From Swiss-Prot:
The keyword Transmembrane helix does not apply. It comes from Mus musculus (Mouse). Pfam families: MAGE. This is Melanoma-associated antigen B16. InterPro entries: MAGE, MAGE_WH1, MAGE_WH2, MHD_dom.
Length: 363
């Protein structure tokens, strides 16, 4: 094996180890009966590994070699399809296992290193779990360079002798991309079997920076939107950190994926209008809470977030009865609003046509 391949494997393993610790950690808050309100969403970042990269926001032809992978995943029901992986654990478990914090390793992340296609024979022999880890890393690299992935490349570089387990490896890697990073992996060219990455739930934000150490932040954003909704459409700072601390994410402590988490949540998510950060009325000393911002309300919905929560929980949205009923009401209101807007538009168009016909007849 060449020295460059050894370094690549070492860097990948280091970051994968850190991400595994993050995903295994679950919130240490007890969950009561599933349909009681409010519930706390705590994303189980279980069995998810990898290194990350950066992204831009434009979309081009889905299978071009320089494909730009952004994206808003508008009106795609595939976002909420049920998980089929048996190793995706429930994040709401009251007996959530605790793990060591990421800071124990003092790793601040390492860049995604692309596999060298010409030197693929020098890659180390990997277990199936290792190949899942490596594929997640490869997916994030492709997200960074705005390219699609082909089945042929994945087979050649990663799956290799485990050809009969391709779909298992792809599925497990895709679930980790979804649960940790808020990204969906979808086949965009069924003929050539090309896959692209899309931001989940209709959101258009991933928080990527223009450097090789940048990680997608959408997974954390979805987690917090879920906490806010499940806690009754408002969550105190304390409630947010009760979810994040068991995952090794602490206010004022630099995280290898998220940098300064408090700054990210309180400044960037608020600035991007996904959250509003406001004082709690009549609190003494003053306390603060988070609610959904205008952009979150415009881009996604309570039903989409609830379906994601249920999927992570390995359950059905109807299990969370009060939240499900609330989400249904919002869906009905949105549908009614759209119908009224369409009716107004049709009426205006009809009046315009009538006026035009009248003018012609007068001439």
């Amino acid at each position: 094996m060449s020295q460059s391949s050894e370094e690549c494997a070492a860097d990948q393993g280091q970051t994968c180890e850190e991400t595994q610790k993050l995903q295994v950690a679950a919130a240490s808050i007890d969950v009561e009966e599933p349909c009681s309100s409010p519930h706390l969403m705590a994303t189980s970042l279980k069995d998810q590994t990898s290194e990350e990269t950066q992204v831009s926001k434009d979309v081009e032809e889905p299978c071009s070699s320089s494909q730009l992978l952004m994206a808003s995943d508008q009106d795609d029901s595939e976002d909420e399809t049920a998980s089929t992986s048996s190793d995706l654990q429930h994040p709401y478990d009251s007996s959530s296992e605790s793990t060591e914090d990421l800071d124990d390793q003092e790793v601040q992340g390492s860049p995604v290193i692309p596999p060298d296609q010409s030197d693929s024979t020098d890659l180390p022999v990997m277990t199936v779990d290792g190949k899942v880890d490596f594929l997640v890393n490869y997916m994030l690299y492709k997200y960074q360079v705005k390219e699609v992935m082909s089945m042929n490349d994945i087979m050649t570089l990663i799956v290799r002798e485990d050809e009969d387990r391709f779909h298992e490896i792809l599925m497990r890697a895709s679930e980790r991309m979804e649960m940790v990073f808020g990204l969906d992996v979808k086949e965009v060219d069924p003929i050539n079997h090309c896959y692209a990455l899309f931001i989940k739930l209709g959101l258009t934000y991933d928080g990527m920076r223009n450097d090789e150490y940048s990680f997608p932040k959408t997974g954390l954003l979805i987690l917090i939107l879920g906490v806010v909704f499940m806690k009754g459409n408002r969550a105190t700072e304390e409630e947010i950190w009760e979810v994040l601390n068991p995952m090794g994410i602490y206010a004022g402590m630099t995280h290898f994926m998220f940098g300064d988490p408090r700054e990210l949540i309180t400044d960037e998510f608020v600035r991007e209008q996904y959250l509003e950060y406001q004082p709690i009325a009549n609190s003494d000393p003053i306390q603060y809470e988070y609610v959904w911002g205008l952009r979150a309300k415009a881009e996604t919905s309570k039903m989409r977030v609830l379906e994601f929560v249920a999927k992570v929980h390995g359950s059905d949205p109807t299990v969370f009865l009060s939240q499900y009923e609330e989400a249904l009401i919002e869906e009905e209101e949105r549908t009614l609003t759209m119908l009224l807007e369409h009716a107004d538009s049709s009426s205006t168009s009809g009046e315009s046509s009538s006026d035009t016909s009248s003018n012609f007849s007068q001439v």
